[in-house]
Amino acid sequence: MGDKNKDDSSSQSKAVRKEKRAFLFRKWTRVDVMRVSAVGAVHLLCLLAPFNYTWEAFRFAAMVGISTNLSITFSYHRNLTHRSFKLPKWLEYPFAYSALFALQGHPIDWVSTHRFHHQFTDSDRDPHSPIEGFWFSHVFWIFDTSYIREKCGGRDNVMDLKQQWFYRFLQNTIGLHILTFWILVYLWGGLPYLTWSVGVGGAIGYHATWLINSACHIWGSRAWNTKDTSRNIWWLGPFTMGESWHNNHHAFEASARHGLEWYQVDLTWYLIWFFQVLGLATDVKLPTDAQKRKMSLAR
């Protein structure tokens, strides 16, 4: 499906493996400890979920998981990071707030990291570069904030967000929002709701996102002549809200649509298109035919 060129070996050779940085025996910052604790708690709750199954909990988890992870891709990624479309603030802010509960951090941090990824893709300065191994690009990079700072410098690439009081507020209070959410979920549905929505939903959301950083730079197909190892993995499309059309994305970073063919499932694009039809999403960016011809591997 959509595989114009399968496993282009020349692109894979661009990522030269780098010597691994020490993971356990290093200085851990407070943020590192908080992150590993949160990720560990989510996976522990996931392990407890089979012993706390109810249909209501499963249904609630599906609703929370889809809405929060769709908010990540719709808000954090395509709206805030790449500015691929514009929203009125009364609509932009609620989506950004909803994304908090996907447990991937606040907008300033997430957007800054992803902008660095595109600026330094597959290089020594890429925050989650595949040249440092699958598990580093998949998850370990998250727990070494000092290393990210060494490679990329300060987060001065998100001044557009730092200038807005709402995003500064989320940055300073994210822990309070997450803890309050977990408490409310527990009070509403007990352990079944907590283990399934936070545990199972959180773990699936984590690994779906992380596979874009790891697997989508190692396996899959390439349709576009990008100067990196980005790839499309079709079967991940529904689970990642359309983000696994990663070679498409790296070819046209500003595009609001990642599934460029009609058969490439892209739930995030469907939501953007819906708001565009309503006149709420404006300045929606899409690649032109000339841009596609220039980037195509088939030319």
Swiss-Prot record:
Domain notes: The histidine box domains may contain the active site and/or be involved in metal ion binding.
Cofactor(s) of this protein: Fe cation
Bilayer-spanning residue ranges: 38-57, 58-76, 174-194, 198-218, 262-282
Protein name per its UniProtKB record: Delta-9 desaturase-like 3 protein
GO CC terms: endoplasmic reticulum membrane
Organism: Arabidopsis thaliana
Extent of motif Histidine box-3: 246-250
Listed CDD domains: Delta9-FADS-like (cd03505)
Motif interval(s): Histidine box-1: 77-82
UniProt motif (Histidine box-2) ranges: 114-118
Family: Belongs to the fatty acid desaturase type 1 family.
Compartment(s) of residence: Endoplasmic reticulum membrane
Pathway(s) the chain acts in: Lipid metabolism; polyunsaturated fatty acid biosynthesis
GO biological process, one term: unsaturated fatty acid biosynthetic process
Keyword entries, A-Z: Endoplasmic reticulum, Fatty acid biosynthesis, Fatty acid metabolism, Iron, Lipid biosynthesis, Lipid metabolism, Membrane, Oxidoreductase, Transmembrane, Transmembrane helix
PANTHER family attached to this UniProt entry: ACYL-COA DESATURASE, DELTA-9 DESATURASE-LIKE 1 PROTEIN-RELATED
Catalytic activity, EC: 1.14.19.-
Source organism, top-level taxon: Eukaryota
Molecular function in Gene Ontology: oxidoreductase activity, acting on paired donors, with oxidation of a pair of donors resulting in the reduction of molecular oxygen to two molecules of water
Membrane topology: Multi-pass membrane protein
